[in-house]
């Protein structure tokens, strides 16, 4: 009987995959531009049509989407992967801001926080996106900053604001009113019943336009003096981070109670660094380093490579259980071992990403029931080293590299026992908002072979605008911890980058770019990207089918974003989010394995993706059918 049910499920899976998508796949021969807003995608298309490459177009889309407050602002952060067809290498761009002067555990604890705050001027790291755009454009683009920023500047001068953004402003207006410069920009109808812009109203951001114009003026003045293109863009960069823009930014930050100093801005710079990557069944999958959560997806792929996923059937109970367990194991490692490598000593990334360690972790999966106690493993022996944190792990109740499925309550640190109450209750709306907290993605490719994947964020609504710059500050400080027993590698310190959720992706096959993909959604990002990748590689979906396919989400992890209390971040072992369309018999199986189920119509992103079809010389694009994500190809 079980064999018959399994066969029926596989046949049903094939039938489901054959269903038409809600949005058509995008096709192009010359270029592809995809991001979170239609107007921002149009900005990329305009740059392509003016002769720019994929890096130029990606920078234009990034600038436009920042200007449109697509869950980020100009004061946020930029993380990018770029495939350079000239060197045939994938490049990692780290334009994440850092903790400012004075940002220490003692400082935040003195104010009653268990984590840095999620909103307000104390939540701000230094801005990274302006520097990230300047760096990418200088080294890998072809156009001037003036050309690339032109669409964003046109938007800042006034564009018809979308209902989603306008309503977000109205919803958050009570908080926005606490900050004078945010109130001035975002609430043009103060005193009226609706104080935010209406949908379709021309939304003007004069302060931001002035800031962008100052950067362009610095570039153009340098060119008139005979400076090179590189030197001219550097002049624009310096005006933002060291000149009069920096002066006003810091004045506005400190007036409102923030910590960022002129020295913090002047000392920060974007970094080009080595990628992190693994091979999954002949496909090289690239991520950023462990200051992001990206390697967690690579760890999960290494674990899942030990199983025949295709034979399980797409979203069968066994498949869901296997993916859930692999994600839990990799996220448990993320929550303890990941952090800014520049501040790390003896960080075990080689061990964490080794195939041998993955086999060890795969052997810990119990196929009878969920393991509510999955904790960090011990990757150090796989580097020939001894784990310096064994006493700490044991004090927290963890037994690395052991079957802990029947160990009572060992998932949580002893000092966090208070948050263990109601652990199997379905997550509430506030928890899910923190789990899914959004951003946007930028994906671009061209016929020359340039491929770009960017996951920017920070400065989302309700944001604190820094003085008269029009620039919303980042809120990424909340991703640090204050207690080394939670994660010894991610404790806040001045000049340090927080361990973020932002995670662009590029996959290579047979030495050529194969996929570029990204997603919004906080801690769910690498969960959804993992399943997108498996949907394409294991189940043969197109990029559009894979962006629309139903995924699962685990809540069995420490939240990276959210409240400043321990109970706001607590893991929820066994909590499993499923799509509304999951069949009854799958639900029954999963409940029998100890899962607490919740259901949503949207469980897949929104994901944006590009597939490079070398066989036919074309480019495919996939863009989620949820939200405003949009793509244009030619």
Give residue spans per PLM region:
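Internal maturation/activation junctions in enzymes
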Residues: 309-457, 601
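Short, well-structured alpha-helical segments that form the helix of a local strand-helix-strand
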Residues: 55-61, 146-157, 240-243, 249-250, ...
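Extended C-terminal subregions enriched in glycine
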Residues: 331, 448, 495-498, 529-530, ...
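Noncatalytic scaffold domains of N-terminal-nucleophile
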Residues: 19-42, 46, 52-235, 240-292, ...
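M16/insulysin-pitrilysin zinc metalloprotease superfamily fold
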Residues: 294-310, 507-515, 523-547
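Sec-dependent N-terminal signal peptides
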Residues: 4-14
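Active-site rim segments in enzyme catalytic domains, especially the processed small/beta chain
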Residues: 67-92, 109, 251, 259-261, ...
């Amino acid at each position: 009987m079980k064999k018959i049910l399994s066969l029926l499920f596989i046949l049903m899976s094939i039938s489901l995959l054959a269903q038409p998508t809600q949005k058509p796949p995008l096709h192009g021969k010359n270029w592809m531009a995809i991001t979170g807003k239609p107007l921002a995608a149009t900005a990329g298309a305009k740059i392509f049509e003016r002769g720019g490459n994929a890096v130029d177009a990606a920078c234009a889309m990034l600038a436009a989407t920042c200007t449109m407050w697509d869950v980020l602002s100009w004061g946020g952060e930029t993380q990018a992967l770029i495939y350079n067809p000239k060197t045939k290498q994938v490049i990692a761009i780290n334009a994440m801001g850092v903790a400012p002067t004075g940002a220490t555990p003692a400082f935040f604890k003195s104010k009653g926080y268990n984590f840095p705050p999620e909103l307000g001027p104390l939540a701000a790291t230094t801005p990274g996106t302006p520097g990230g755009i300047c760096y990418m454009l200088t080294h890998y683009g072809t156009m001037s900053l003036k050309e690339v920023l032109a669409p964003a500047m046109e938007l800042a001068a006034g564009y018809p604001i979308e209902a989603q953004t306008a309503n977000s402003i109205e919803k958050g207006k009570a908080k926005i009113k606490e900050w004078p410069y945010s109130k001035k920009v975002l609430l043009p109808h103060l005193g009226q019943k609706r104080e935010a812009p209406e949908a379709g109203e021309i939304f003007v951001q004069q302060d931001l336009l002035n800031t962008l114009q100052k950067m362009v003026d610095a570039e153009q003045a340098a060119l008139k003096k005979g400076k090179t293109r590189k030197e001219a863009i550097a002049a624009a960069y310096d005006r933002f981070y060291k000149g009069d823009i920096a002066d006003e930014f810091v004045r506005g930050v400190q007036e409102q109670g923030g910590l960022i100093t002129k020295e913090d801005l002047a000392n920060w710079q974007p970094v080009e660094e080595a990628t992190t990557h693994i091979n999954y069944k002949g496909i090289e999958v690239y991520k950023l380093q462990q200051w992001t959560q990206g390697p967690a997806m690579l760890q999960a792929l290494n674990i899942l490579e030990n199983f025949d996923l295709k034979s399980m059937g797409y979203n069968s109970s066994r498949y869901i259980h296997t993916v859930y367990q692999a994600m839990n194991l990799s996220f448990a490692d993320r929550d303890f071992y990941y952090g800014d490598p520049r501040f790390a000593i003896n960080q075990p990334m080689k061990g964490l990403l080794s195939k041998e360690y993955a086999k060890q972790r795969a052997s810990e999966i119990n196929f009878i029931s969920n393991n509510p106690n999955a904790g960090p493993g011990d990757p150090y022996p796989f580097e020939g080293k001894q784990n310096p944190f064994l006493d700490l792990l044991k004090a927290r109740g963890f037994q690395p590299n052991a079957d802990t499925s029947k160990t009572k309550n060992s998932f949580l640190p002893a000092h966090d026992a208070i948050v263990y109450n109601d652990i199997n209750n379905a997550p509430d709306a506030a928890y899910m908002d923190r789990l899914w907290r959004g951003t946007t993605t930028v994906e671009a490719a061209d016929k020359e072979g340039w491929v770009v994947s960017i996951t920017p964020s920070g400065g989302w609504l309700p944001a604190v605008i820094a003085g008269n710059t029009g620039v919303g500050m980042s809120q990424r400080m909340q991703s640090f911890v204050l207690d080394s027993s939670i994660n010894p590698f991610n404790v806040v310190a001045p000049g340090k980058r927080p361990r973020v959720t932002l995670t662009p992706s590029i996959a290579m096959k047979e030495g050529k770019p194969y996929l570029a993909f990204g997603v919004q959604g906080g801690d769910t990002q690498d969960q959804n990207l993992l399943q997108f990748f498996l949907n394409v590689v294991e189940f043969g979906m197109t990029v559009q089918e894979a962006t629309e396919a139903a995924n699962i989400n685990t809540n069995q992890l420490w939240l990276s974003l959210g409240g400043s209390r321990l109970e706001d971040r607590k893991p929820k072992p066994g909590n499993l989010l499923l799509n509304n369309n999951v069949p009854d018999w799958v639900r029954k199986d999963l409940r029998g394995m100890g899962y607490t189920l919740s259901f949503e119509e949207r469980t897949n992103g929104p994901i944006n993706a590009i597939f490079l079809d070398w066989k036919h010389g074309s480019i495919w694009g996939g863009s989620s059918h949820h939200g405003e994500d949009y793509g244009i190809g030619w």
